[in-house]
């Protein structure tokens, strides 16, 4: 990972490279203007295709390339509800593979937009977080509402959304429209939760490309950058998020609002797909009626659904994805946007 650290600061700075729109350009062929850096140093790749996010960095060779391919396969393979290899889906879940929500290591269009809520084809490319208004969890439910389930098992609930559209104007008079989502959860498997008692957050999938570079950064460097990110005139104060996992206090690096110290691929398999592993060996619906319903449908809970080696391969796959270079950097409109982005506000 040391070759990542050399370029770590560039991940937090203005990133650019000279124009290159043709696939297959080698990093040594690129002239980097003074004061700029490639998006991910030696992990920068030059692809504009639909698989640009799902391509290994050029330094992935030999045994690492084999493991990358295996991890990629596990990431994309559809899990089934059988008890053999590739099984373990459910009893409740949100998606049936990592790739169902993170297509080509990017984002799948959420069923929130395509179907107005929970998906009707066995997966919902979104996560529905539920809690009490004070942040506590509800009895009979966890932090995520699992709105999908295998055949014969009852989902925890179903989400629907309606949008309210409002029109506003910029100072120069140009109009724009914002839509406000209004969420409703129905078909609760246990006691119905009243809307006035419920805090619901719906999150669309994250892109996974570039996370390897975040993992490679020196925590001291991140803390130093956060210390500089204070803008009292705007009411902004940058700070790191520290978390405690398994009794160890660490700097949060991944997940929504940096709630995890690593890529937590095991949590994704467990919470999103119901696939048990050595880090999360219990079913995500442990203690709920869905466990018994799953048993009646033939599920066995006597073994882990994926091995530690398989999880390590998925982790390596995500850590070593190449990061596409910025495109169209010499386009006049892009240059204007870059200047606006980096200029102090009036």
Name the predicted role of every residue range.
Residues 341-346:
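Conserved small/polar residues in nucleotide/adenosyl-binding loops
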Residues 68-78, 100, 334-340:
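Extended, hydrophobic/aromatic-rich amphipathic alpha-helical segments that build helical scaffolds
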Residues 315-330:
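His/Cys-centered metal/cofactor-coordination and adjacent catalytic loops
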Residues 46-47, 53-67, 77-311, 315:
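Extracytoplasmic redox metalloprotein regions
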Residues 1-42:
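Bacterial Sec-dependent N-terminal signal peptides
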């Amino acid at each position: 990972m040391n070759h990542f650290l050399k370029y770590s600061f560039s991940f937090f700075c203005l990133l650019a490279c000279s124009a290159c729109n043709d696939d297959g350009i080698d990093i040594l062929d690129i002239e980097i203007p003074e004061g700029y850096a490639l998006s991910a140093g030696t992990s920068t790749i030059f692809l504009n295709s639909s698989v640009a996010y799902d391509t290994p960095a050029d330094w992935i060779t030999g045994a690492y390339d084999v493991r990358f391919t295996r991890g990629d396969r596990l990431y994309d393979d559809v899990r089934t509800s059988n008890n053999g290899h590739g099984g373990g889906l459910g009893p409740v879940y949100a998606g049936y593979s990592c790739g169902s929500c993170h297509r080509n290591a990017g984002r799948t269009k959420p069923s929130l937009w395509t179907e107005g809520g929970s998906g009707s084809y066995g997966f919902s490319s979104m996560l529905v977080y539920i809690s009490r208004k004070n942040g506590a969890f509800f009895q009979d439910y966890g932090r995520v509402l699992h709105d999908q389930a295998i055949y014969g098992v009852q989902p925890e609930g179903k989400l629907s959304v309606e949008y309210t559209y409002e029109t506003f104007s910029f100072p120069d008079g140009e109009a724009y429209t914002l839509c406000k989502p209004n969420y409703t959860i129905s078909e609760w498997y246990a006691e119905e939760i009243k809307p006035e008692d419920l805090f619901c957050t719906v999150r669309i999938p994250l892109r996974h490309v570039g996370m390897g570079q975040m993992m490679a950064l020196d925590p001291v460097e991140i803390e130093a950058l956060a210390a500089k990110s204070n803008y009292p005139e705007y009411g902004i104060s940058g700070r790191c998020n520290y978390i405690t996992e398994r009794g160890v206090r660490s700097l949060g690096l991944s997940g929504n609002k940096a709630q995890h110290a690593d890529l937590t691929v095991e949590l994704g398999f467990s919470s999103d797909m119901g696939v048990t592993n050595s880090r999360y060996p219990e079913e995500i619906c442990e203690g709920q009626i869905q466990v018994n319903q799953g048993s009646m449908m033939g599920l066995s809970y006597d073994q882990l659904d994926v091995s530690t080696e398989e999880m390590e391969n998925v982790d390596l796959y995500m850590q070593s994805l190449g990061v596409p270079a910025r495109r169209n950097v010499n386009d006049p409109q892009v240059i204007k946007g870059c200047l606006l982005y980096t200029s102090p506000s009036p």
